[in-house]
Amino acid sequence: MSVKIIVPSLGESVTEATIAKWYKKEGDPVKTDELLLEIETEKVTLEVNAPCDGTIGKISKTDGANVAVGEEIGEINEGAAANTAGTNNESAKAQAVTQPTSEKPVEKPAVVNNILAPSVQKLVTENKLDPNNIKGTGRDGRITKGDVLETINTPSAATSTPTVNKTNEERVQRVRMSRLRKTIAQRLKDSQNTAAILTTFNEIDMSKVIALRNQYKEEFEKKHLVKLGFMSFFVKATIEALKLIPSVNAEIDGDDLVYKNYYDIGVAVGTEQGLVVPVVRDADKMGFAEVEKAIGTLAKKAREGKLSMADLSGGTFSISNGGVYGSLLSTPIINPPQSGILGLHKTEERAVVIDGKIEIRPMMYIALSYDHRIIDGKEGVSFLVKIKELIENPEKLLLNL
């Protein structure tokens, strides 16, 4: 009896996907819930597992094919896995009897690319890691992104791949754009072509918020089991600024302006596959600890490729922190259909004038890119001034002033 392999439901409003990679070929034995393939949507990569024990009977859609939800992409001949495995074992025993023993130690076989997810293989290659020395914690011992990232943080755990002199043919690598990368490219270009994007800047003295964090970070972590970062301060300050300037939390829908009375804040996260913006829902109803936990959870899921469509959908305003990469100044691009995005940057000590005296202070440039069709210049400037006021006086955030 054959069992169909079909494209699963991909979330609300998502009807198409692309087959990223098959991990099995026709004739391979499989067990229930064993990984068969990965498919990519516009925002996430999803795994498709075997619905039963058996053998791959047919693969009707190969790597790179565009497929629809519910479409048949292959078949499993049910119940044949055990028999196939038994045959393979007998064959292996026969070979063991007839093959002469070599005096030279057999080298440990290299991990073949096709048992690594594309994103994992890319990360391994970019960091020149030997996958044989990475302990896999995924299903059936598969290496996950988290395993690779942990290895990168403890470099002694993996042996670097020796540098090889490349031929002229190997100096250029042509790689098909992933569905996520194509979506990012299209959305950013659409944003530039549709919105009247304008960027305004300000700078913040981070002295007080740094002092407050340093004073309470250990006590905060001990009580809430999460580290106190700066992003929670900026999320809370952003919400207060959005309440003051409602147009920044609005969007254009045809001939209508839609003002949103809720605050779902997107926080941009860079991954090896590209930039994603998971959403912290109803952030205005959260305390600092809840915001930090939500951001930490979403960032971890993003790095491991486990974000769901629900994690990425919606959002009324976004925050992007280029400072973690060392950026001093940038003009972030609006994430449509939102009307604004806040850009944070690297905190750097600079000479500033305080009460007529030159002092060294930790300063950060902030930027607001906004859609000038809906937000006036005065509103954009006032929005940043409010954030500056709250971050430079963090007690106002704590006292809800």
Swiss-Prot record:
Instruction: Spell out the catalytic residues.
Output: H372, D376
According to its UniProt record, what is one Pfam family this protein matches? Answer: E3_binding
> Which molecular-function annotations from GO does this UniProt entry contain?
dihydrolipoyllysine-residue succinyltransferase activity
Catalytic activity from the UniProt record: N(6)-[(R)-dihydrolipoyl]-L-lysyl-[protein] + succinyl-CoA = N(6)-[(R)-S(8)-succinyldihydrolipoyl]-L-lysyl-[protein] + CoA
Of the GO CC terms on this record, one is: oxoglutarate dehydrogenase complex
State the top-level EC class: transferase
Query: What Enzyme Commission number(s) apply to this enzyme?
Result: 2.3.1.61
Instruction: Tell me the pathway.
Output: Amino-acid degradation; L-lysine degradation via saccharopine pathway; glutaryl-CoA from L-lysine: step 6/6
Provide the coiled-coil residue spans. none
Q: What are the recorded Gene Ontology BP terms?
A: L-lysine catabolic process to acetyl-CoA via saccharopine; tricarboxylic acid cycle
Reading the lineage from the top rank, the first entry is: Bacteria
The alphabetized UniProt keywords are:
Acyltransferase, Lipoyl, Transferase, Tricarboxylic acid cycle
Keyword Acyltransferase set for record = yes
Family classification: Belongs to the 2-oxoacid dehydrogenase family.
What is the annotated role of this protein in its UniProt record?
Answer: E2 component of the 2-oxoglutarate dehydrogenase (OGDH) complex which catalyzes the second step in the conversion of 2-oxoglutarate to succinyl-CoA and CO(2).
Q: How does it assemble?
A: Forms a 24-polypeptide structural core with octahedral symmetry. Part of the 2-oxoglutarate dehydrogenase (OGDH) complex composed of E1 (2-oxoglutarate dehydrogenase), E2 (dihydrolipoamide succinyltransferase) and E3 (dihydrolipoamide dehydrogenase); the complex contains multiple copies of the three enzymatic components (E1, E2 and E3).
Which PANTHER family does the UniProt record give? Answer: DIHYDROLIPOYLLYSINE-RESIDUE SUCCINYLTRANSFERASE COMPONENT OF 2-OXOGLUTARATE DEHYDROGENASE COMPLEX, MITOCHONDRIAL, DIHYDROLIPOYLLYSINE-RESIDUE SUCCINYLTRANSFERASE COMPONENT OF 2-OXOGLUTARATE DEHYDROGENASE COMPLEX, MITOCHONDRIAL-RELATED
Q: Can you say what this protein is called?
A: Dihydrolipoyllysine-residue succinyltransferase component of 2-oxoglutarate dehydrogenase complex
Source species of the chain: Rickettsia felis (strain ATCC VR-1525 / URRWXCal2) (Rickettsia azadi)
